[in-house]
């Protein structure tokens, strides 16, 4: 089986994968879930990509790299420096080469759901429950609230993406059909128009590793074995 590296997004730390990881280990996959730095306000895309790269064993040959939400933005930088089996964008953002993230937002189409604008789920419990954990069981939602972070993305948002050529690597995109943060319509569009792939859909909110870990593990395991 392959090594699956799970990269958390901007609102939860690496503990967010604790329900998913055991399901991926059942068929024999090895799992990594690196922690991105939350105490580096000047961190840009290259810094986050370096953290991911440094977490990968040098001798690992069949690496499936999965990123959730904002961290999808860093995957091409990793793939440009390390041979990978495939990239999996899980309800994730993608960079537009030659543009900053803010440039991409202005150019459209709309990436985020309108009601998500200005919300801070780290400080606002109601926002976290409504936008991130609305389809989780009460027990899981209570635990998930303890994993909240805010990843510094100021430089990521304003810098021109530091890559001039998209890496040659197989890619897949998982759309969360009940997502209340990242627009499912945008996710479907970006999968087809930017990655050139048919999106895979899960009937879940933004965090299916919490609400549907068994289903998500099945999808990821299949991708890790067939790509």
Describe the predicted segments one by one.
Residues 146-165, 169:
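Active-site nucleophile elbow and catalytic-triad environment of alpha/beta-hydrolase enzymes
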Residues 80-125, 155-161, 183-184:
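Flexible "cap/lid" loop of the alpha/beta hydrolase fold
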Residues 30-64, 101-110:
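Active-site loop/oxyanion-hole signature of alpha/beta-hydrolase fold enzymes
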Residues 173-175:
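Short beta-strand/loop motif that positions the catalytic acidic residue
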Residues 177-203, 210, 222-223:
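Conserved loop-alpha-helix segment in the C-terminal half of the alpha/beta-hydrolase fold
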Residues 48, 210-224:
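Post-His helix in hydrolase/transferase enzymes
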Residues 66-71, 75:
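Gly/Ala-rich beta-loop-alpha elbow adjacent to hydrolase catalytic centers
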Residues 2-41, 61:
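Conserved HGGG/HGGXW glycine-rich cap/lid loop of the alpha/beta-hydrolase fold
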């Amino acid at each position: 089986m392959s090594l699956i590296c799970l990269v958390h997004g901007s609102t939860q730390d690496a503990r967010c994968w604790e329900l998913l990881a055991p399901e991926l280990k059942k068929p024999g996959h090895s799992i990594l879930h690196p922690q991105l730095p939350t105490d580096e306000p000047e961190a840009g895309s290259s810094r986050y990509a370096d953290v991911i790269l440094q977490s990968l064993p040098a001798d690992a040959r069949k690496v499936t790299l999965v990123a959730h939400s904002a961290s999808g933005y860093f995957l091409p930088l990793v793939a440009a420096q390390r041979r990978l089996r495939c990239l999996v964008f899980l309800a994730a953002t993608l960079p537009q080469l030659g543009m900053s993230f803010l440039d991409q937002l202005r150019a459209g189409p709309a990436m985020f759901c309108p009601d998500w604008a200005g919300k801070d789920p780290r400080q606002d419990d109601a926002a976290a429950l409504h936008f991130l954990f609305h389809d989780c069981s009460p027990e899981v939602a209570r635990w998930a609230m303890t994993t909240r972070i805010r990843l510094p993305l100021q430089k990521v948002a304003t810098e021109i993406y530091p890559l001039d050529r998209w890496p040659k690597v197989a890619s897949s995109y998982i759309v969360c059909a009940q997502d209340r943060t990242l627009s499912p319509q945008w996710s479907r569009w970006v999968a087809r128009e930017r990655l050139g792939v048919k999106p895979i859909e899960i009937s879940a909110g933004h965090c299916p590793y919490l609400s549907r870990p068994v289903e998500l593990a099945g999808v990821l395991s299949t991708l890790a074995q067939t790509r």
